[in-house]
């Protein structure tokens, strides 16, 4: 039913006043705004496809959690590296004071251009984070980790003092302030989190994340990363197989899973991703122990096929392009990086991915 001329005139006056008072774009019709999801690649093709939009969404809060040594920091460093490759700016807030520039460089991070902060308190870390977000010049901010955001009162107090709920209140207040700014600045704000065990749980999952419940609600994407098995070459352990479950996803269907190799001192194995996803999507063919691209042999055994692609990066690039082009929603999912990137990309894929939904 059409709106009456009087109501239309009153509505136009109200919208004009809101735009003058709060800035253009403070309110708009849904038809005026292109539904778009800008994404930053994760460094893992399998995870990009599982996320449904080609990577982690910009302008959103993301939580990555898991047990110790499961690959949380490695994954974020690959996201930082992908951001830098595409001309973006990244910041790493190292609340744990454990940042390793050598390993970050091995993961592809340009450490000379990376902004790194090692704050003394949780309040300082989140204030730095807010300043960076509001600048509009940062594409990705990683906070490592929520568990290390110690409130000032706890640091200044004595050992054994009780500070119940301080960290949860700190996170709740910070996320209330940050969520709107993150959306407007198109910054991807990534929180790494640790697991704790709930005491006395008889039924259900006893695991929980630190920092209260606020982050669970504000996060648009939550990724649960776990080590599945060790990768061995002979008797030597050379890496670990990681499985990531998309526990929450507001931009695409959730509960998809992705697996990839994390090689020690190298990070995520791009070639392993290409082999695995290529076979799943039938771009590569496996016959017995041999892997083929068309009629061309890549190698006997997965490790040999990975090594062949590592020795032939141009071929690996070509296969990756074929995978992304053949993935569900490929013509619509658009990857955009750069603080000055236009706020427009095609809609997120809402179809079924190659990874089974649970």
Curated annotation (Swiss-Prot):
Disulfide bonds: none
GO cellular component terms, A-Z: cytosol
Residues that coordinate or bind ATP: 66-73
Localisation: Cytoplasm
Protein's job: Can catalyze the hydrolysis of ATP in the presence of single-stranded DNA, the ATP-dependent uptake of single-stranded DNA by duplex DNA, and the ATP-dependent hybridization of homologous single-stranded DNAs. It interacts with LexA causing its activation and leading to its autocatalytic cleavage.
Family label: Belongs to the RecA family.
Annotated NCBIfam families: tigrfam_recA
Protein name as catalogued: Protein RecA
Species whose genome carries this gene: Herpetosiphon aurantiacus (strain ATCC 23779 / DSM 785 / 114-95)
GN (gene name): recA
């Amino acid at each position: 039913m059409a709106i009456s001329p009087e109501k239309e005139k009153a509505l136009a006056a109200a919208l004009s006043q809101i735009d003058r008072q709060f800035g253009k774009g403070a309110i708009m019709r849904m038809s005026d705004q292109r539904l778009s999801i800008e994404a930053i690649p994760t460094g893992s093709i399998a995870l990009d496809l599982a996320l449904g939009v080609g990577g982690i969404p910009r302008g959103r809060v993301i939580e990555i959690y898991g047990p110790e040594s499961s690959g949380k920091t490695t994954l974020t460093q690959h996201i930082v590296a992908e951001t830098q490759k595409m001309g973006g700016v990244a910041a790493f807030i190292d609340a744990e004071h454990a940042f390793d520039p050598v390993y970050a460089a091995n993961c592809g991070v340009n450490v000379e251009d990376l902004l790194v902060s090692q704050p003394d308190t949780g309040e300082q870390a989140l204030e730095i984070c807010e300043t960076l977000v509001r600048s509009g010049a940062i594409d990705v901010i990683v906070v490592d980790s929520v568990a290390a955001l110690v409130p000032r009162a706890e640091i200044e107090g004595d050992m054994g003092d009780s500070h119940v709920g301080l960290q949860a209140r700190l996170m709740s207040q910070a996320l209330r302030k940050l969520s709107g700014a993150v959306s407007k600045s198109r910054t991807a704000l990534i929180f790494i989190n640790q697991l704790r065990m709930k005491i006395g749980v008889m039924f259900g999952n006893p695991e929980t994340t630190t920092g209260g419940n606020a982050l669970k609600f504000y996060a648009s994407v939550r990724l649960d990363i776990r080590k599945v098995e060790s990768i061995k070459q002979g008797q030597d352990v050379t890496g670990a197989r990681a499985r990531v479950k998309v526990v929450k996803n507001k931009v695409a269907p959730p509960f998809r899973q992705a697996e990839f190799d994390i090689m020690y001192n190298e990070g995520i194995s791009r070639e392993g991703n290409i082999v695995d996803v290529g076979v799943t999507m039938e771009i590569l063919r496996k016959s017995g122990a041999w892997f083929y691209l068309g009629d061309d042999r890549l190698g006997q055994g997965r490790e040999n096929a990975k090594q062949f692609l590592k020795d032939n990066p141009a071929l690996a690039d070509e296969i990756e392009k074929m995978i992304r082009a053949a993935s569900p929603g490929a013509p619509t999912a658009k990857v955009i990086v750069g603080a000055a990137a236009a706020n427009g990309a095609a809609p997120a894929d809402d179809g079924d991915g190659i990874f089974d939904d649970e």
